[in-house]
Amino acid sequence: MTTSFYFLLVALGLLLYVCQSSFGNQHTRNSDTPKHRCGSELADQYVQLCHGKRNDAGKKRGRASPLWQRQGFLSMLKAKRNEAFFLQRDGRGIVEVCCDNPCTVATLMTFCH
């Protein structure tokens, strides 16, 4: 009986050790550690951090109306192409910044308004 008791005690100790080591890392990890976020994880994190607000570069630059209305463009296609150029974030989108490369929460929040 003592052999089976020790075996049970060792098995229970190992089980507790495994549970503690796997769940304990969640609280010790720095939330601002660079991490790859792709797909639904990236989208969920974005919505959670930004609360549905998005980074509108036009508002940041004080544009009250679309570029084609303010500049009197003759071609709507040309106006939209130029406006899309200004809305890019240094040519890098959220997927390139946070999925292709690891990014921090602070970097991800730069895409919020």
Swiss-Prot record:
Tissue note: Expressed by the venom gland.
Modification type Histidine amide: residues: H51
Cellular localization per UniProt: Secreted
Post-translational modification: It is noteworthy that in this dimer, in contrast to Con-Ins G1, the chain B is amidated and not the chain A.
Propeptide: 22-29, 52-92
Main localization category: secreted
Pfam family for this entry, one: Insulin
A Gene Ontology molecular function term of the record: toxin activity
This protein's UniProt keywords: Amidation, Carbohydrate metabolism, Cleavage on pair of basic residues, Disulfide bond, Gamma-carboxyglutamic acid, Glucose metabolism, Hormone, Hydroxylation, Secreted, Signal, Toxin
SUPFAM superfamilies found in the cross-reference section: Insulin-like
Signal peptide region: 1-21
4-carboxyglutamate, modified sites: E41, E96
Any Gene Ontology CC annotation: extracellular region
Covalent S-S links between cysteines: C38-C99, C50-C112, C98-C103
A GO biological-process term: glucose metabolic process
Residues recorded with modification 4-hydroxyproline: P34, P102
Further information: Venom insulins constitute about 1/25 of the total venom of C.geographus.
Function: This venom insulin, from a fish-hunting cone snail, facilitates prey capture by rapidly inducing hypoglycemic shock. It is one of the smallest known insulin found in nature and lacks the C-terminal segment of the B chain that, in human insulin, mediates engagement of the insulin receptor (INSR) and assembly of the hormone's hexameric storage form. Despite lacking this segment, it both binds and activates human insulin receptor (long isoform (HIR-B)) with only a 10-fold lower potency.
Complex formation: Heterodimer of A and B chains; disulfide-linked.
Family: Belongs to the insulin family.
Protein name according to UniProt: Con-Ins G3b
